């Protein structure tokens, strides 16, 4: 595990890397080119490494104002090119997001307890229905419904449908 962390420190700001370490005495240090070798040599059990988000990490996603439970939910990271958050259209309803410049926030739980709590209580898959009136919070939107309908027509062969899906990024 320490060797894996040393590799992250070596990569530093290059993804996937790490930007900070926290020493056992609680002091936080930024990893710089000048300090990188010193930090790698000093790294022992007890140090914490603040690494970049990686595929599978749990994060909390919300949009202000957080008026109800669905305004803050846990999602799992899938790292893609670019420096933006991306949200599946089926998960937009509880956030009242409509892709017109909505400001969203992402938070990374810092302890094992917080990560477990996020997975158990806040996971999108466990919050499909509104606790207020038992209606769906997550579901297909207009474009997905229309697209599924069009795919169900006999106008496309299976091969053509697969090519369309593949070119749209679904493999």
Language-model-derived ranges and their functions:
Residues 66-67, 130-171:
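Flexible, glycine-rich loop/tail regions that form catalytic "lids" or insertion modules at the edges
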Residues 1-128:
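Core mixed alpha/beta domains of very large multi-subunit molecular machines
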